[in-house]
């Protein structure tokens, strides 16, 4: 599948480094020590994934990118930051319109759209999450999704000190694809940018 990642929160070089480590199974230190091995491992997908900086861009620009590149998969990292608030009385209305535009792009360009978003403060310290815990939205963003995966981590414990708990909980809170809802518990492998069981 041809994929394009439009990132507007972190620099595209940092996002690209995470995709490299996830795809190769090599940490950045290993990549630096053995770049030829990393290049060989990344080669099968190198031409199938494009990562572009999208800072300050809107959904019209996203649509023009889809017309040019014709991706099978489009990742909006972060989807909410493509929204424009002009002409809307409330921020949630702008986010809903943004999600509707993303869905229209998926239909028109026959591609899967992954719309990444933040969780609200309501999700802090909780393992079991629901649709209402997405940042800045009432029901608008959720209504446009076919599948929603919300990622939680364990609440901090007093005696943990500086030890980072890497357990994560993938909450499937909406699923029009198969109908299954539930929680999958896994570990964050931050050195590789992967969620692993």
Task: Give the location of each predicted region.
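Cofactor-binding loop segments of dinucleotide-utilizing enzymes, especially the Rossmann-like FAD-
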Residues: 8, 118, 153
């Amino acid at each position: 599948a041809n994929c394009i990642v439009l990132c507007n929160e972190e620099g595209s070089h940092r996002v690209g480094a995470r995709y490299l480590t996830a795809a190769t199974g090599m940490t950045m230190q290993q990549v630096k020590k053995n770049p030829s091995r990393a290049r060989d491992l990344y080669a099968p997908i190198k031409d199938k994934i494009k990562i572009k900086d999208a800072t300050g861009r809107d959904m019209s620009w996203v649509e023009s990118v889809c017309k040019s590149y014709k991706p099978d998969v489009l990742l909006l990292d972060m989807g909410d930051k493509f929204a424009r608030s002009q002409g809307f009385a409330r921020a949630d209305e702008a986010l809903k319109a943004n999600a509707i535009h993303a869905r229209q792009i998926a239909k028109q360009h026959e591609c899967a759209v992954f719309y990444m978003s933040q969780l609200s403060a309501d999700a802090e310290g909780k393992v079991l999450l629901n649709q209402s815990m997405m940042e800045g939205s009432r029901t608008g963003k959720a209504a446009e999704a076919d599948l929603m995966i919300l990622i939680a981590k364990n609440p901090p414990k007093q005696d943990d000190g500086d030890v980072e708990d890497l357990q994560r909980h993938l909450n499937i809170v909406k699923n029009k694809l198969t109908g299954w809802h539930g929680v999958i518990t896994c570990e964050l492998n931050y050195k590789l940018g992967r969620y692993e069981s």
